[in-house]
Amino acid sequence: MDYYDFWKKELDLDKKYKLKGFSRGSLRTGFILLPCRIFLDAGVPSPIKPNAILITHGHQDHIDCLYNHLLDNNEKVQVIGTNTLIDNLKDYLNSCRTMNVGYKIKFDKWAPKSILNNLIINIDNIKYYIETIKLDHEVECIGYGLSEIRNKLKNEYNKLSSIELANLKKNNIQIIEEILYPILFFCGDMNYTSLLILPFNSYPYFIIECTFFQLEHIYDARSKKHLHIVDLIPYFQKYINTIFILIHFSCRYTKNQINEYKKKYNFSNVIYWI
């Protein structure tokens, strides 16, 4: 695969935000939200430099390119994850740096940020609210809900003229309030039991794994704590106003096979990220 082939597929989420990326189970997973350049996992080489990186868990196919993402940046990039993951990534990045220079050294070209439940980050003078949900996987794993924080005129002042609003401002009356503009939810790898706790009604887009399709692979899904298409179908049917972006297909399926499953399991609110 050519270097730039990873980034050929893209999707306009709305008038402002665009999603690009690539994902195959046990191979590579990584997405970029543009124009803010927020990376969702770090398993794919990229010509674009990140402003922030959200890491769901530490499996190699999700962090394989983290070290390279962090090099040659003018500013230290925010890398967000759980406390345990951040501690492990420190050791991982130190080892990467050591192997590249040939002697023991610490890697310091990053800004690690541990997240417990939620976090606010600032990118290009825009604030983003990040919420997390713990997922059941082979290792500690979380999903990320991402929203932009926008300013909105309070409802009680909607009918006032610009002159009246200006007078209120002069009197130090707060006429603006912050609201959340949900963008997407990015799920890490997970067992089917985690589906019960996900906020499908709260985000317009849900990027979620669908590792297995064949019925005989349900056992593999259970033993490896991944999702099978049959786990997801009830949620496609229930949350018809949510768009599901399916990723992380097992490498045992060819592209042609996945397209056949796409025809078989065809839902108007489902996008197969092939």
Task: Tell where the protein language model's regions lie, with residue ranges.
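Active-site environment of divalent metal-dependent phosphoester hydrolases
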Residues: 47, 60-63, 87-88, 138-140, ...
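Conserved beta-strand hairpin/beta-sheet module of binuclear metal-dependent hydrolase folds
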Residues: 1-51, 142-146, 152-153, 176-187, ...
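Extended recognition/assembly regions associated with phosphoester-bond processing machinery
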Residues: 1-29, 115-118, 130, 185-187, ...
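Active-site-proximal loop/helix segment associated with metal-binding centers of metalloenzymes
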Residues: 123-215
